Curated annotation (Swiss-Prot):
Name assigned to this protein: Ubiquitin-fold modifier 1
Natural source organism: Theileria parva
Domain of life: Eukaryota
Lineage: Eukaryota, Sar, Alveolata, Apicomplexa, Aconoidasida
Coiled coil: none
Cross-link Glycyl lysine isopeptide (Gly-Lys) (interchain with K-? in acceptor proteins) residue location(s): 89
InterPro entries linked: Ubiquitin-like_domsf, UFM1
Gene Ontology CC entries for this record: cytoplasm; nucleus
Gene3D superfamilies the UniProt entry points to: Phosphatidylinositol 3-kinase Catalytic Subunit, Chain A, domain 1
One GO BP annotation of this record: protein K69-linked ufmylation
């Protein structure tokens, strides 16, 4: 976490999990920002519909968007994956 004039910030490295090239974006946001806003911004950066995206950890654990960015950073770390919801689930 880094300290600025407007409060502490957290930095996330968000990888687009659905792309074979694994592109990523690095986002720095205020730690009190709602994580749903982080998901929305990350999806827009990858030109995806935010309403159809989710963020997961590298281990595949889904992250509840009702938390703050700081809470997510403390629980899950800075390396996260953005995945379109049409790719979430299991196929036989």
């Amino acid at each position: 976490m880094s300290e600025t004039k407007c409060g502490a910030k957290v930095t996330f490295k968000i990888v687009l999990a659905s792309d074979a090239n694994q592109p990523y974006k690095v986002l720095s946001v205020p730690e009190q920002a709602p994580f749903s806003a982080v998901i929305k911004f990350a999806a827009e950066e990858f030109r995806l519909n935010p309403a159809t995206c989710a963020i997961i950890t590298n281990d595949g654990v889904g992250i509840n968007p009702t938390q703050t960015a700081g809470g997510v950073f403390l629980k899950y770390g800075s390396n996260l994956r953005l995945i379109p919801r049409d790719r979430v689930g299991f196929y036989y």
